[in-house]
């Protein structure tokens, strides 16, 4: 008789190699939610990064401090706040977004936007110090300066986006609160791993774990390639 742990690993590999439909469904939803949240956070975060790096204004230092503080914001707190906003008694309750993928996107976006903004500000600030005199001498409008800075820091921003995506797809606290972990609707890899483990379905949990690890590995490889290209160009 095979060892239960060995059998669980074997069954997990079988699920992956056979492209189990439930596994693919969970993976697909995870990617859609996290990619959407990353795009939203990328746009908002890059805008804030440019703003904080190039334009001095009253309260700028305080805003930077708040952003840095939000980097350590617990995901369950984000989930709780979004839950309150989207609940029936909340201000956005009539929209009926609670326990939907949209609610999960909102939670993940709030969670990773400070990360993108803080890291973007650091990257853009360094480039701004180097080329600010040139850009100012050309008399470019602010939007053109912003686009130039984004273009000049594109590799750094790509790495930041990959980091944010990795943070989003591995998140569990917020999405399980606002999504409800509903099968076929809001069940993603992390919440499914937690559920299947509690049910004793170790094989399926392991299969999801392997897929999640593979996803993170691909992200790290892409980030490494981006760093290499940045070093070559820069």
Name every feature range the model reports, one short phrase each:
Residues 16-18, 178-217, 225:
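Interhelical loop and adjacent transmembrane-helix boundary motif
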Residues 119-120, 142-174, 228:
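Transmembrane alpha-helices
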Residues 1-38, 55-57, 149, 198-201:
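Periplasmic/extracellular loop-to-transmembrane helix junction in inner-membrane transport proteins
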Residues 4-14, 21, 78-110, 179-182:
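Membrane-interfacial helix termini and adjacent extracytoplasmic/periplasmic loops
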Residues 34, 38-50, 76, 80, ...:
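Hydrophobic positions within alpha-helical transmembrane segments of bacterial inner-membrane proteins
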Residues 29-37, 70, 143, 147-159, ...:
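Alpha-helical transmembrane segments of multi-pass membrane proteins
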Residues 118-130, 136-139, 143-148, 206-234:
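C-terminal transmembrane helix and the adjacent membrane-cytosol boundary/short C-terminal tail
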Residues 36-67, 142, 149, 222-227:
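Transmembrane-helix boundary motif in ABC transporter permease subunits
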């Amino acid at each position: 008789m095979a060892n239960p742990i060995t059998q669980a690993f074997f069954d997990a590999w079988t699920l992956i190699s056979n492209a189990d439909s439930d596994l693919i469904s969970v993976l697909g939803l995870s990617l859609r939610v996290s990619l959407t949240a990353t795009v939203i956070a990328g746009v908002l975060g890059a805008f804030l990064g440019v703003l904080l790096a190039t334009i001095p204004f009253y309260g700028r230092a305080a805003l930077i401090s708040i952003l840095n503080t939000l980097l350590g914001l617990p995901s369950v707190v984000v989930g709780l706040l979004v839950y309150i906003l989207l609940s029936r008694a909340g201000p956005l309750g009539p929209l009926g977004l609670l326990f939907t993928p949209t609610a999960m996107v909102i939670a993940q976006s709030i969670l990773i936007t400070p990360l993108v903004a803080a890291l973007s500000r650091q990257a853009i600030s360094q480039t701004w110090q180097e080329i600010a005199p040139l850009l100012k001498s050309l008399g470019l409008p602010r939007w053109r300066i912003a686009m130039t800075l984004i273009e000049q820091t594109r590799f750094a921003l790509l790495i930041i986006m990959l980091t944010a995506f990795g943070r989003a797809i591995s998140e569990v606290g917020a999405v399980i609160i606002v999504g409800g972990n509903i099968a076929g609707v809001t069940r993603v890899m992390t919440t499914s791993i937690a559920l299947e483990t509690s049910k004793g379905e170790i094989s399926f949990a392991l299969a999801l774990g392997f897929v999640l690890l593979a996803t993170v590995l691909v992200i790290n490889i892409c980030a490494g390639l981006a760093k290499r290209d940045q070093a070559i160009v820069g």
